Amino acid sequence: APINVQPIVLFAEEGELNPLFGKALNVARTAGTAVMIVDTGRIMGVIVFKDSKAEKVRVIRGFREEEVDDVNALLSILSEGRAKVAVYTFDVNEIIEEVIDSAFAAKAVRRDKKVREE
């Protein structure tokens, strides 16, 4: 089943990242939602809020997955890539794991296809 996304999309130039993400994270925190950060179609991270604290941030770069528990660490990772990012909010009850798993599955399929072609 497709996941129903009600997005908050914020585009930021470098230098605007901190205030924009701060705003997005506050919206997510008060609404009891999770935030998925997408950079040019790749899922960069998912932040799940419980009791007004960031429970986890899963940052996906290529095939590596990193746990980050600090918003500033996440911002520095994002700023290493493209300056334009989008922030999507999900209801916490939505199946966020499915989003992440499907992203990994798609990457794995593409990698496998490339290996076979070589």
Model-identified regions with their sequence ranges:
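Acidic, Ser/Thr/Pro-enriched low-complexity segments and adjacent helix/loop capping patches
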Residues: 1-118
